UniProtKB/Swiss-Prot annotation:
PROSITE patterns named in the record: CARRIER, PHOSPHOPANTETHEINE
S-S bonds: none
Its biological purpose: Carrier of the growing fatty acid chain in fatty acid biosynthesis.
Pfam families, per database record: PP-binding (PF00550)
Domain of life according to the entry: Bacteria
Organism: Campylobacter lari (strain RM2100 / D67 / ATCC BAA-1060)
Carrier domain location: 1-76
Stated name of the protein: Acyl carrier protein
Gene, per the UniProt record: acpP
Keywords for the protein's UniProt record, in alphabetical order: Cytoplasm, Fatty acid biosynthesis, Fatty acid metabolism, Lipid biosynthesis, Lipid metabolism, Phosphopantetheine, Phosphoprotein
InterPro entries cross-referenced by the UniProt entry: ACP, ACP-like_sf, PP-bd_ACP, Ppantetheine_attach_site
GO cellular component terms listed in the entry, alphabetical order: cytosol; membrane
Pathway assigned to this chain's UniProt record: Lipid metabolism; fatty acid biosynthesis
Modification sites for O-(pantetheine 4'-phosphoryl)serine: 36
Family designation: Belongs to the acyl carrier protein (ACP) family.
Length: 77
């Protein structure tokens, strides 16, 4: 779960949340309190961390941390 750990670090840094609340099933907006600007900044930070490009149309589908992890795993295949 190395990708999850890296995603968690980015989420904690970007959203200023405690790492204990960042779980695979956590919803980025509802559970972690992100607003639309937070989501944009989070996506940009994830793109930089993993050296990937996440189109806006895909970013809208990333609701839970699990979605982010799976998306990045698929990009790295």
């Amino acid at each position: 779960m190395a990708i999850f750990d890296d995603v968690k670090k980015v989420v904690v840094e970007q959203l200023s949340v405690d790492e204990d609340v960042v779980k695979m099933e956590s919803k980025i907006i509802e559970d972690l309190g992100a607003d639309s600007l937070d989501v944009v900044e989070l996506v940009m930070a994830l793109e930089e961390k993993f050296d990937v490009e996440i189109p806006d149309s895909d970013a809208e589908k990333l609701v839970k941390i699990e979605d982010v992890v799976n998306y990045i795993e698929n990009l790295q295949k």
